[in-house]
Amino acid sequence: MATPPPPQLSSTSTQPPSPSSASSNPQQPSPPKTQPPLPRFLDNDPARTGYDPTVKWWLNYFRIMTGQVTREGVEHYREDRYKANEARDCARCEADRAYLFAYSPTIRFLRDKVAALNGTLDETNVVCRRCPARVAEDGRVVRQGGGFSPEHGILICANEMRDRSHLEDTLAHEMVHAWDHLRWKVDWSGGGNLRHAACTEIRASMLSGECRWTRETMTRGNWTLTQQFQNCVRMRAIQSVMARPTCRDDVHATKVVNEVWDSCFSDKRPFEEVYR
C-alpha cells in the first residue's frame, strides 16, 4: 500500500501563538538526561484473563457478560473483534470521511484554510486504518483515535470511531494540527521544549468540538456545569503531552500546559470563535 503524500509546506514563518505565557519566563524546563522506560505490554494468557481466542466469539461474549473474564481479557477480546471487523470498519470510515469532506461546514472550512497555506488534505493523505490497542503491565489501555504526521498526513483509527460525529471531531482535531504545522514551525519531536506540542493540543481540543458540553455529558458522563469546557481541554492536552517521549510524567505535562495556557487557549485561528 502506497504511503500517502504529506501536506505541502507553506512558506509562512510567523512564530506560534505563545508570546505572553512562554516568552515571559526565560526558565526552560531542562530535558531529561535519560528517556523514561517504555511501557511493557501484556499478551493474552487465557489462564490469567479467562479469554480464550480459540473458541467461538459468542462463547467469550457470554463469559464476559457473566463476569468470568478479567478487564485485561475484555481488552484482548475487543482487539480480536476489531481485527475480525477491520474491512467493515475501514469501509464505513471511508464513507463517513467522504461525506464530511463534502458536507461538514467545519471540515470544509479547515480544508479551505489548509489549502490557503498551500497544503492539501483529501482521501490520499487522510487514511482510515485499524489502530491496535495494547494493555500495559500497570493495567493502562493504550489506544488512540487518530494522529497527524507532517510526513504522511492524517490517520483516522476506524475501529475506534463510534459514529460519524465522533469521526468529525477526530478529523477536525487532526486538521487543526495540520493547519498549525503549515502556519508555524511546530516542533513535533519535543526536543526538550514541549510548549509547541502543548499549544497545538490545546488549540485542537478547543476548536474540534470534542470538548463541547453535549459530547462530555452524553458520551463521557461528565455533567459538570462550571469550567467543564476549560477542564476538558486542559485534561486532553495534558494527556497528549504525556504521550511525548520527552515528557517525564504528568507533573511535567501539567507544568508545560499551564505555561502556554493563556495565550494558546485564547487563540481561535483559523476560526473567529469556538463554534462547536
From Swiss-Prot:
Its EC number is 3.4.24.-. Residues 9-27 have a biased composition (Low complexity). A divalent metal cation binds at H173, H177. It is an enzyme of class 3 (hydrolase). One of its GO terms (biological process) is mitochondrial protein processing. Keywords: Hydrolase, Membrane, Metal-binding, Metalloprotease, Mitochondrion, Mitochondrion inner membrane, Protease. Disulfide bonds: none annotated. Residues 1-46 are annotated as: Disordered. It holds the Pfam family Peptidase_M76. It is a peripheral membrane protein. Residues 28-39 have a biased composition (Pro residues). InterPro entries: Peptidase_M76_ATP23. GO terms for cellular component: mitochondrial inner membrane. It is found in: Mitochondrion inner membrane. Coiled coil: none annotated. The active site is at E174. GO terms for molecular function: metal ion binding; metalloendopeptidase activity. Has a dual role in the assembly of mitochondrial ATPase. Acts as a protease that removes N-terminal residues of mitochondrial ATPase CF(0) subunit 6 at the intermembrane space side. Also involved in the correct assembly of the membrane-embedded ATPase CF(0) particle, probably mediating association of subunit 6 with the subunit 9 ring. Belongs to the peptidase M76 family. PANTHER family: MITOCHONDRIAL INNER MEMBRANE PROTEASE, MITOCHONDRIAL INNER MEMBRANE PROTEASE ATP23 HOMOLOG. This is Mitochondrial inner membrane protease ATP23.
